[in-house]
Regions:
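Serine-hydrolase catalytic machinery in alpha/beta-hydrolase-like enzymes
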Residues: 2-59, 63
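Flexible "cap/lid" loop of the alpha/beta hydrolase fold
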Residues: 18-27, 95-113
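Short beta-strand immediately N-terminal to the catalytic nucleophile in serine-hydrolase-like folds
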Residues: 66-68, 93, 116
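Gly/Ala-rich beta-loop-alpha elbow adjacent to hydrolase catalytic centers
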Residues: 68-72, 76
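Short beta-strand/loop motif that positions the catalytic acidic residue
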Residues: 114-117, 121
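C-terminal catalytic histidine-bearing segment of alpha/beta-hydrolase fold enzymes
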Residues: 130-174
Length: 174
């Protein structure tokens, strides 16, 4: 028996364009410098959260799966690739790489990654999954991708099933 934990935290701010949601940075501000700066702040918050979880549950990074949707996917990729300790794997839904040059410079690890995106996503265009896949492959990260037909900016049942299978395989759960 080994301890495992699945992290999927909400953003630390109420969503500016969807009051029932959360965000890591303000979605209404379309400014690259702002987004990069806010992503760095969010990384600090997430890393503190993860360290606290590891301490509270006496769990290793190698038994932690990072998962996220939209901005959460973006943050999961950033955290996983830049952390000094390697996480078990990453599952990302409908996201993208925020700053490829910065991430490439700071990359320390490359856990196996699954990216899932809808072909009808009106918020984060599906082309982002292809760019992310290319980036991850060029940076020696094992990546699997799945584009789901007629799927907008949400997580359908098919995506949840694929993610569960991927997580179970990586955590060696039968």
């Amino acid at each position: 028996y080994k301890r495992q934990i699945f992290l999927c935290p909400n953003g630390h701010q109420r969503c500016s364009i969807n009051p029932s949601g959360y965000q890591w940075f303000d979605l209404s501000i379309d400014d690259e410098k702002y987004i990069k700066a806010e992503a760095v702040k969010a990384e600090i918050i997430l890393n503190k959260f993860i360290e606290q979880v590891k301490k509270n549950y006496n769990i290793l990074s190698s038994n932690i799966v990072l998962c996220g949707f939209s901005q959460g996917c973006m943050m999961a990729i950033n955290i996983a690739l830049t952390n000094r300790e390697k996480f078990n794997c990453v599952v990302g839904f409908s996201g993208k790489i925020i700053d490829k040059d910065d991430l490439e410079r700071r990359k320390k690890n490359g856990p196996e990654t699954l990216l899932i995106h809808g072909d009808a996503d009106e918020v984060v265009p599906v082309s982002n999954i292809l760019e992310a896949k290319d980036f991850l492959i060029r940076n020696n990260v094992s990546v699997n991708t799945k584009i789901i037909k007629n799927c907008g900016h949400h997580i359908p049942i098919e995506a949840s099933s694929l993610a569960l299978h991927f997580i179970k395989k990586n955590l060696e759960i039968k």
